[in-house]
């Protein structure tokens, strides 16, 4: 009896990390880190570097969605158990600094540059006290995955440059558009003007106290198989998505970019590639409230992009299970869809919806599951 008790104690000591409960992801539930604290990494993304996953996201306070801490980082070997690695990019107390404490810093994503050996972080930035008027990107770099990241700059995208997918005739037509003729929004004429480049032209140059360049709000990053990287963001007052190529060191734009679904009101882009085809899941623009997910595909990341039906299936699919897309994580030959259930009244209590992506009839499907384990899908 004593021997059996000793064996039982030994099993309890060595096997907890293999328990079914510990290896289960429960979408929408509290997800605790190694300290027993709900993971605070919202609107973020995950990379796999040398066999370790690193999750970066917005640190949310209890009462405000403004950035009071910065971008946090967690690490994991199995996608379930996460270790708090600290603040990868802290906000600063210097008055007037771009990332001053109290700014809006959202949707941080990190990619690794094989040539420079640096980790590059991009995020959506709004200056303190300016609401959502600035619509900037921010970029920072680090020599290690956990940071600290060094802030480089913020700004708007590709000032003075037309999209590469616009013909000369389309550019000439857009150049004739006058915002003064479209003061009333949401009319058929205004919508047509947006599609034709009304806001695109407006933001080509500095105006109304704003710097030149395209607006950049909800965003993600994508590194292609040829190691070229792209910045995908919601622009033109959240009415049109842009896909912009990054320089070889991933810290700036080359000037080459395209528009996706002009006037379609898409945000929260999450992109992945399977069997040579690019897929992008987005959401509509309904503030903090969830809506039906959208999906697009393309044979080239620079388009053209084709829209498909909502990929979500199951209870709550019509509102993306109460969440909003933030990232698609490649894991081996599969993919994990990541979304956030926002709680603006209690931001730090926002929840995560992670679900495996399946393919049916050639189309991605995100099916609701109360719980699932990465192992059952072959994720390692």
Q: Which sequence ranges carry the predicted segments?
A:
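Carbohydrate-active catalytic/glycan-binding domains of CAZyme proteins
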Residues: 18-380
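Bacterial Sec-dependent N-terminal signal peptides
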Residues: 1-21
């Amino acid at each position: 009896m004593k021997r059996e008790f000793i064996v039982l104690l030994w099993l309890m000591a060595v096997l907890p990390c293999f328990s079914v409960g510990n290896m289960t992801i429960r979408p929408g539930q509290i997800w605790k880190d190694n300290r027993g604290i709900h993971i605070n990494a919202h609107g973020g993304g995950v990379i796999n570097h040398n066999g370790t996953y690193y999750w970066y996201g917005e640190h949310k306070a209890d009462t405000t969605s403004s950035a009071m801490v910065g971008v946090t980082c967690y690490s994991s070997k199995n996608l379930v158990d996460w270790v708090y690695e600290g603040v990868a990019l802290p906000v600063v107390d210097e008055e007037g600094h771009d990332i001053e404490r109290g700014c809006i810093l959202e949707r941080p994503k990190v990619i690794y540059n094989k040539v420079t050996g640096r980790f590059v972080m991009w995020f959506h930035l709004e200056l303190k006290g300016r609401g959502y008027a600035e619509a900037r990107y921010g970029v920072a770099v680090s020599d290690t995955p956990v940071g600290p990241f060094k802030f480089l700059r913020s700004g708007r995208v590709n000032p003075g440059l037309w999209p590469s997918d616009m013909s000369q005739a389309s550019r000439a037509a857009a150049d004739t558009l006058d915002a003064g003729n479209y003061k009333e929004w949401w009319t058929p004429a205004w919508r047509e003007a947006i599609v034709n480049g009304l806001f695109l032209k407006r933001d080509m140059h500095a105006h109304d106290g704003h710097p030149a360049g395209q607006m950049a709000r909800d965003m993600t990053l994508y590194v292609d198989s040829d190691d070229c990287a792209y910045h995908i963001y919601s622009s033109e007052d959240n009415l049109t998505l842009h896909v912009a190529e990054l320089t070889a060191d991933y810290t700036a734009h080359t000037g080459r970019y395209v528009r996706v679904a002009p006037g379609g009101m898409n945000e929260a882009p999450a992109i992945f590639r399977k069997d040579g085809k690019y897929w992008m899941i987005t959401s509509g623009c309904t503030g903090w409230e969830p809506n039906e997910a959208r999906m697009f595909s393309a044979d080239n990341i620079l388009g053209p992009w084709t829209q498909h039906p909502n990929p979500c299936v199951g209870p709550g699919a019509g509102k993306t299970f109460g969440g909003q897309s933030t990232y698609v994580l490649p894991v081996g030959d599969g993919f994990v869809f990541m979304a956030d259930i926002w709680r603006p009244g209690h931001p730090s209590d926002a929840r995560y919806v992670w679900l495996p992506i399946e393919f049916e009839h050639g189309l991605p499907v995100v099916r609701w599951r109360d719980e699932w384990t990465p192992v059952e899908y072959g994720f390692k």
